[in-house]
């Protein structure tokens, strides 16, 4: 896989920080990282640590998604609903951790250990269920099969 431009929406929050850590630990081919957060984080001069560097946080706004290949969403529902469709319009594929798209019939709700193939039917946004749901489903999935 070639290096990707990856944006993390909500990069300064706890979930966003974990996403960054997972990207780094799994040696995901990030060519350029675009950490996005609120105006408050930008005004405070926040940075995120990634691959041994401090990367400045940019404002989460529609134009921030220009040239982005993948967006990992770790923002609140309202921010996700407002910005992820904008990212898709600009060509990104979004994996969202908020509640915003979980019940949307056009958005696959994916637990990779169970229904990873559903990713193929996405229209730009892929949702994941609540963490407690994932924890409950993974061990009982073999019983269902």
Regions found by a protein language model. Name each.
Residues 1-145:
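N-terminal Rossmann-like NAD(P) cofactor-binding subdomain of oxidoreductases
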